[in-house]
Design a protein with these regions (language model features):
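Vicinal oxygen chelate
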Residues: 1-34, 68-73, 117-159, 163-165
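A short alpha-helix capping/helix-coil boundary motif
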Residues: 11, 53-55, 106-109
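Short helix-to-loop capping/linker segments positioned immediately adjacent to catalytic or ligand/cofactor-binding
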Residues: 17, 50-52, 85
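Glycine-rich loops and low-complexity Gly/Arg-rich segments
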Residues: 19-20, 41-43, 64-67, 88-92, ...
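Core segments of cupin and vicinal oxygen chelate
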Residues: 20-26, 58-59, 65-103, 134
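Short, well-ordered, mixed-charge alpha-helical segments that flank or form enzyme active sites
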Residues: 25, 37, 47-49
Length: 185
């Protein structure tokens, strides 16, 4: 994190909090260009147990989604820590996913995304819905964000969107040649 902090400083990041030292978990916080408070804490320095590698009850986490007004501008802001574009979609709303040091960071112009949120893939819709009902979590079915089948409100207020599959799907190329023979009759 100390190395990233130096790079971020070189790129004009203005930290609200910065604590870097040899014998502590390095930590920093700042606000992004859309006003979201971001806090980064040094990664663990121990090996995780095999049990901890399993998916959560929500399924497999695949993205931290941030609502942005201008995806390209936000991408420029995040470039010092998220240099690799993983996937991009322009329609129906612009959405870019970057590798932010092994954290998939999504930047979305979707009006349905109100705050930073976590996205999960879960093929067991019935099982998950039974679990959230049993636990009494606050949910919204079909919340309108990228085809999620449910939005679960965590106790501290974070929204967890759950999808049957990754909404950006597999990469594909669009043929824009205009040649009608490209389309079967």
């Amino acid at each position: 994190l100390a190395k990233h902090a130096r790079s971020m400083t070189d790129h004009g990041f203005d930290f609200d909090y910065l604590h870097l030292d040899e014998d502590v978990f390095n930590e920093l916080s700042f606000r992004d260009r859309d006003g979201h408070a971001v806090r980064m804490v040094e990664a663990r320095t121990f090996n995780v147990t095999a049990d901890a590698e399993h998916d959560s009850a929500c399924g497999s986490w695949f993205e931290l989604s941030l609502p942005v007004k201008d995806t390209v501008g936000a991408a420029q802001f995040w470039a010092p820590v998220a240099q690799t574009l993983l996937q991009m979609r322009e329609e129906p709303t612009m959405h870019m996913r970057f590798d932010a040091t092994r954290v998939p960071l999504g930047l979305s112009e979707s009006i349905a995304l109100k705050a930073p949120s976590l996205c999960f893939r879960n093929g067991d819709r019935k099982g998950l819905m039974a679990l959230v009902e049993q636990r009494g979590f606050e949910i919204e079915k079909y919340p309108g964000y990228e085809g999620a089948f449910v939005a679960i409100k965590a106790p501290e207020g974070t929204t967890l969107f759950v999808f049957e599959e990754d909404f950006l799907g597999e990469s594909y190329e669009v043929d824009e040649s205009g040649d009608i023979s490209d389309f079967p009759s």
